Curated annotation (Swiss-Prot):
An annotated GO BP: regulation of ubiquitin-dependent protein catabolic process
Assigned protein family: Belongs to the TMEM168 family.
Keyword Nucleus attributed: yes
Record's protein name: Transmembrane protein 168
Signal found in the keyword field: no
Amino acid sequence: MCKSLRYCFSHCLYLAMTRLEEVNREVNMHSSVRYLGYLARINLLVAICLGLYVRWEKTANSLILVIFILGLFVLGIASILYYYFSMETASLSLSNLWFGFLLGFLCFLDNSSFKNDVKEESTKYLLLTSIVLRILCSLVERMSGYVRHRPTLLTTVEFLELVGFAIASTTMLVEKSLSVILLVVALAMLIIDLRMKSFLALPNLVIFAVLLFFSSLETPKNPVAFACFFICLITDPFLDIYFSGLSVTERWKPFLYRGRICRRLSVVFTGMIELTFFILSAFKLRDTHLWYFVIPGFSIFGIFWMICHIIFLLTLWGFHTKLNDCHKVCFTHRVDNNSLDRIMASKGMRHFCLISEQLVFFSLLATAILGAVSWQPTNGIFLSMFLIVLPLESMAHGLFHELGSCLGGTSVGYAIVIPTNFCSPDGQPTLLPPEHVQELNLRSTGMLNAIQRFFAYHMIETYGCDYSTSGLSFDTLHSKLKAFLELRTVDGPRHDTYVLYYSGHTHGTGEWALAGGDILRLDTLLEWWREKNGSFCSRLIIILDSENSTPWVKEVRKINDQYIAVQGAEMTKTIDIEEADPPQLGDFTKDWVEYNCNTTNNICWTEKGRTVKAIYGVSKRWSDYTLHLPTGSDVAKHWMLYFPRITYPLVHLANWLCGLNLFWICKTCFRCLKRLKMSWFLPAVLDTGQGFKLVKS
């Protein structure tokens, strides 16, 4: 007995000590990383102080001494605010502002007369050490998981250091100072571009780095200090391209959730920047040396640039109009926790973004061509504006590209509920006895409420929910289904997915039992679908809560020319009534909707003893399905809806770009592998890409 108690006590003590060591190891690791950041900051402060001291010693400029002493005084105040008054935000803001100012001041002071001085060489090595420590600290923080990525465009540290650097540039002449201030704005745009993971962010980073050390930008006076400022600011957003796990809408949240007026003003502000760049490009016409090349080139590509950027601004304006509509719906359905992703998908934002991505690409191409034609290597203001415009348009292209890739397609749904539980000898539904009417009405109402909840949660446009106790005739159902299957979005194209729900009596072979002895076969429904779908690539998903859905599930697997899925239910025939209630129509709908609308559900479709099991089948080409891509006619309709006639000639260029199909060999191989997977290893849970899943037990 004593041995057992001693063993239990020693075992518990060992576990406690092991856990304590793990906690201490984590704390020590976190502290080490934090101290590494402090070391990088202190090293940078020493480098700045030594650099300013060398310049004061060699030039005897009293302004340097005044700023040096003032800088130390401000940093002392920041330390007092931090340690004695616990004003961390004010202290860090003040210190970051002065770090940016002092580093900028160090950049723009001439050191040509004492480049080989020992103290100046020490300053350079200290700055290089600061770069290495800063990169190492950021990398270790992210690899250890100590960084919490939050949606932001610019952090407070980045903004204040950029402002401080811009203020330091005012010590130069007005023209040179303006050039540097614009360069700082361009650097801020590049940081945002990297943090948003734009498709063209890395090429923009390369272009910025190549152009950064032009003499007209006043960087060569102290390129090491300039490189230190640039790399320290770029490190975090550059590493976050890999380490950040934020989704598209999370990254763009500061912009997408901005107020309506602010987003509209951003379009106006973008237009002013673009116009300024065009005016600065026109200064190239003063160059009479190559007038025979410059004048024709600027005239042709300038007109092309103007047309493309009119389209660009109208595209941004149209995007914000659709986004405002999405915010209205989001505000209305706030209690239902509808995410902006689903709302944008339901409003056809994916189709809009796919077309807009191509149009913005033309704007980027036009800017690159105009910049090359009107290149002015000695004009720092032109170069800075060029570096502002590129990431600005790159961000717009990246936003449309990512939203077009991640958003689900549009969908529309139609539900039919025929509450009949008893059948005549010939298999036709009959009216229920009065004592069962109330129970059946409650169950049918529950099915209607569940499917309406499903449509609302997944932002599926509702065509209708028909409830009929006497059944539907074949002609009535024919007219309703044809009207449902030919529905289109507001922008013109067909919906990506059509969801048809049916709960009612079926025959043993799966046909729907209709009023008057009529039936609806799957072949008949497919014929109507082919007639309405035509050459489009929409999907039809049929959800059956009936006693005989298995025949349709098996039959749909033989279809080869359409994208169709059938989600059905299997009800256990033999069951011990003492252990569980017999399955009824509506039980599957309740569980399936709860599974797809509640992320914290505990429904397990494969558990033993389930009275209602799930089964689904898909057509042979189901895995080939991709969301509807804009066709030539879609682009033409989009053009007529949003843009003036003067821009119509570009529609042919847009259609040509839509028709490009690069990497077709890789896509073909990947398609074959997915077909094999769906035919041989049908997954237990199949994501439809619309937010809900098909399941099988």
